[in-house]
């Protein structure tokens, strides 16, 4: 079944205050669109500041793919308000454009219409754009325009002091890192519950399949919407951002050093497939290098151990320096029923589940078990709502009904919820009551609700209706925690920071590239 966490929960019930101070941050991606739903081909609006250096508003793969970032904080309502204010501000300054409310893009006629994110003339800015050029040439631009929500989560030092006996984060970085890797292993084993509950991409526009081979047996509506009747998150399927060449990297999550060792090997491992592309076409650079990963961020993962980097530090060097500081959950689709793409219920569930993941026993995991876990995830991603769906337990032949495993998990989460609610309110317990019902009635899941709308309206109609509704809602709402003046200050500061980077460059881009890549 699932690990017995009763002793750990009893221990936590005796120490309820050690969970005070959980820190969270949210990152939300969204495409800028025109009034008819087409991808905006305009530059990143100058009224939003410089995407390279803005603290809260940047771009991801494409110039039209906005990314909103909240600072880390310990107040859920403040984080939601902060993210809402970023959306309100953006809606106010977009000129006749709106934000696409779904994970999967729709009205993109051709990949040539997708402009890579531009970050100015500095070497670091050009490097970021070249990395995206490499992604386009390796995997195609369309799949890089898929949007998601990332959730950053860290437990307070008081928890680690009580749980593993550390004195502080610096001296206890190895034990804390081991705790987060324990969380990650349990996430791989049981995190399929996230797409089951919150997957919101059960369908795609037929244009997304143009020129792409797929073994999926899609059903189609008259307007060209393609769907799988029991799917939860096609964003997380191999139609989305996956990398077949990464499947044999054997990166494991048993401890910090083996993880980093695997990651560093991957960024230096040559790829025959990508070598055929070369690094230049004439005088134009087309990728950073020909290795399996151009940089560490190219590694596809539903969860990542993270530490804030300093200067030009790589993510793995930051982890080596200070250990794991927080984890980044990358399995959330955009929630179409929330103007900001995510809601408080989802955040509170993730708190509960991630705490459970760190409490539950987590034996070391080899690459074979990791493959078994991925098959479980895939089963839920493609057929999670199928009546009687089974879920594998470990790598043997043992299977249990998904609903049974889900309910058992929630019996533990209810105890975690009571602990978190012990200081005030019943919000976490209400989340449990709401979500456990989905295991008896899958029509209550996000994917089922979304699919019903998409089948009746088409993806385009559904997305456009919501984009219009949310635009009007956002521009009519008042700011809650950030003022117009603060947005203006950060906009000017971001431009000044980018200008400074461009002035301070002392070497040519080719020299910079050689320094960064070693080749």
Swiss-Prot record:
The keyword Ligase applies. One of its GO terms (cellular component) is cytosol. Pfam families: Glu_cys_ligase. Keywords: ATP-binding, Glutathione biosynthesis, Ligase, Nucleotide-binding. It comes from the Bacteria. It catalyses: L-cysteine + L-glutamate + ATP = gamma-L-glutamyl-L-cysteine + ADP + phosphate + H(+). It is an enzyme of class 6 (ligase). Its EC number is 6.3.2.2. Pathway: Sulfur metabolism; glutathione biosynthesis; glutathione from L-cysteine and L-glutamate: step 1/2. One of its GO terms (biological process) is glutathione biosynthetic process. GO terms for molecular function: ATP binding; glutamate-cysteine ligase activity; metal ion binding. InterPro entries: Gln_synth/guanido_kin_cat_dom, Glu_cys_ligase, Glut_cys_ligase. SUPFAM superfamilies: Glutamine synthetase/guanido kinase. HAMAP family: Glu_cys_ligase. Belongs to the glutamate--cysteine ligase type 1 family. Type 1 subfamily. This is Glutamate--cysteine ligase. It comes from Photorhabdus laumondii subsp. laumondii (strain DSM 15139 / CIP 105565 / TT01) (Photorhabdus luminescens subsp. laumondii). The gene is gshA.
């Amino acid at each position: 079944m699932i690990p017995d966490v009763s002793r750990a929960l009893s221990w936590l019930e005796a120490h309820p205050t050690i969970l005070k101070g959980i820190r969270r941050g949210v990152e939300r991606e969204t495409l800028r669109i025109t009034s008819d739903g087409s991808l905006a081909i305009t530059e990143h609006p100058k009224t939003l500041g410089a995407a390279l250096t803005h603290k809260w508003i940047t771009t991801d793969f494409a110039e039209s793919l906005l990314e909103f970032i909240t600072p880390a904080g310990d107040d859920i309502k403040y984080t939601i308000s902060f993210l809402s204010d970023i959306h309100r501000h953006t809606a106010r300054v977009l000129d006749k454009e709106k934000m696409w409310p779904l994970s999967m893009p729709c009205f993109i006629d051709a990949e040539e219409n997708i402009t890579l994110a531009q970050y100015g003339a500095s070497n670091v800015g050009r490097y970021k754009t070249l990395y995206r050029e490499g992604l386009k040439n390796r995997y195609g631009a369309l799949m890089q325009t898929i949007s998601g929500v990332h959730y950053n989560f860290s437990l307070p030092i008081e928890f680690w002091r009580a749980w593993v006996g550390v004195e502080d984060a610096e001296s206890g970085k190895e034990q804390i890192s081991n705790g987060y890797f324990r969380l990650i292993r349990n996430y791989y084993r049981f995190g399929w519950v996230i797409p089951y509950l919150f997957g919101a991409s059960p369908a795609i526009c037929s244009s997304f399949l143009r020129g792409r081979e797929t073994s999926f047996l899609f059903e189609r509506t008259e307007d060209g919407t393609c769907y799988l009747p029991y799917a939860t998150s096609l964003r997380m399927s191999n139609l989305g951002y996956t990398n077949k060449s990464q499947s044999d990297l054997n990166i494991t999550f048993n401890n910090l050093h083996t993880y980093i060792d695997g990651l560093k090997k991957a960024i230096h491992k040559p790829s025959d497939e990508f070598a055929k592309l070369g690094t230049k076409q004439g005088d134009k650079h087309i990728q950073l290098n020909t290795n399996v990963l151009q940089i560490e961020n190219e590694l596809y993962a539903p969860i990542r151990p993270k530490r804030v980097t300093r200067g030009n530090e790589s993510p793995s060097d930051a982890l080596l320096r200070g250990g794991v500081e927080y984890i980044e959950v990358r399995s959330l689709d955009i929630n179409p029923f929330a103007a900001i793409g995510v809601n408080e219920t989802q955040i509170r569930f993730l708190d509960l589940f991630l705490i459970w993941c760190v409490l539950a026993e987590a034996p070391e995991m080899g690459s074979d078990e990791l493959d078994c876990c991925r098959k479980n995830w895939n089963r839920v991603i493609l057929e999670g709502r199928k009546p009687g769906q089974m879920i594998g337990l470990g790598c043997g032949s043992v299977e249990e009904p998904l609903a049974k495993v889900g309910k058992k998990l929630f019996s533990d989460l209810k105890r975690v919820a009571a602990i978190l609610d012990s200081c005030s309110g019943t919000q976490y317990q209400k989340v449990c009551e709401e979500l456990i019902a989905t295991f008896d009635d899958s029509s209550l899941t996000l994917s089922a609700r979304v699919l019903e709308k998409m089948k009746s309206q088409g993806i385009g109609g559904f997305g456009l209706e919501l984009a219009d509704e949310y635009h009007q809602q956002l521009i009519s709402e008042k700011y809650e925690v950030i003022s117009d003046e603060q947005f203006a200050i950060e906009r000017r500061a971001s431009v000044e920071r980018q200008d400074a980077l461009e002035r301070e460059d002392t070497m040519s881009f080719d020299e910079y590239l050689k320094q960064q890549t070693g080749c």
